[in-house]
Amino acid sequence: MPTKVVKHFLNQGLLRTKIDEWLAQNFYEAGYSRVKVVQTSLGTNITIWAERPALIIGRRGATIRRLQEVFQTVFGLPNPRIRVEQPENPMLDARVQAFRIARSIERGIHFRRVAFAAINRIMSNGALGVEITISGKLTSERARFEKFKAGKVYKSGHKVDELVDRASAYARLPKGVIGVDVIIVKPGKPGDHVRIKSEEEVKDVVDAIRSEIESLGLQEETASTLREHMEAARPGEEHEEDREES
């Protein structure tokens, strides 16, 4: 049976999941990304990241005040203090891009055009790879999916936790629901990274090695010359010492 401590953390995780789903559903147009909830002795600090923070703040903070009431009454968070920020790079945020693709499809833009535009936008911001999967009744009554990919996309391994961001969204159309799945490999240096040097870089390395070898050769030649001079000078020194003794 789980202890009280385990139950406490399970309930906290469940509460954060409910808050995240509620915000994603209600601030879909704002490009909602994620939320962070920190409970302190003075109240609850809530940080919300979204592509368009103004839609969450509202006119003169009206939406923020309504959010505070929801957090207090629905989720039972005492004294909530809300802060809204924009992600560091919305173009590399999988959830923001998934919501943007879904909104574009809902506006009637062809899904292939939306997917290719999103790939160009994401890759131009430094992503190592991106994969977009769009599924549903795309061109006929029969459901299917199409996958669009660029760069290198990791599906397993420890690099998934370090570099990969993944999110899903849904576009609601009269003919049915279209699913959007986005995987973004953020900028970084993976373990299997191999960089091939250019001809100029290879030439510079070869020249540096050659000069180092030549300098070592000169040092050895100088040392051998000194040894020869020292050996040649020794018999004369011994002869002078013999004459002094005689």
From Swiss-Prot:
The keyword DNA repair does not apply. InterPro entries: KH_dom, KH_dom-like_a/b, KH_dom_type_2, KH_sf_prok-type, Ribosomal_S3_C_sf, Ribosomal_uS3_arc, Ribosomal_uS3_C, Ribosomal_uS3_CS. Residues 226-237 have a biased composition (Basic and acidic residues). It comes from the Archaea. Residues 19-98 form the KH type-2 domain. Keywords: Ribonucleoprotein, Ribosomal protein, RNA-binding, rRNA-binding. GO terms for biological process: translation. Signal peptide: none annotated. PROSITE patterns: KH_TYPE_2 (PS50823), RIBOSOMAL_S3 (PS00548). Pfam families: KH_2, Ribosomal_S3_C. GO terms for cellular component: cytosolic small ribosomal subunit. Residues 218-246 are annotated as: Disordered. One of its GO terms (molecular function) is rRNA binding. Transmembrane segments: none annotated. HAMAP family: Ribosomal_uS3_A. Belongs to the universal ribosomal protein uS3 family. Part of the 30S ribosomal subunit. PANTHER family: 30S/40S RIBOSOMAL PROTEIN S3, SMALL RIBOSOMAL SUBUNIT PROTEIN US3. Binds the lower part of the 30S subunit head. This is Small ribosomal subunit protein uS3. The lineage of its organism: Archaea, Thermoproteota, Thermoprotei, Desulfurococcales, Desulfurococcaceae.
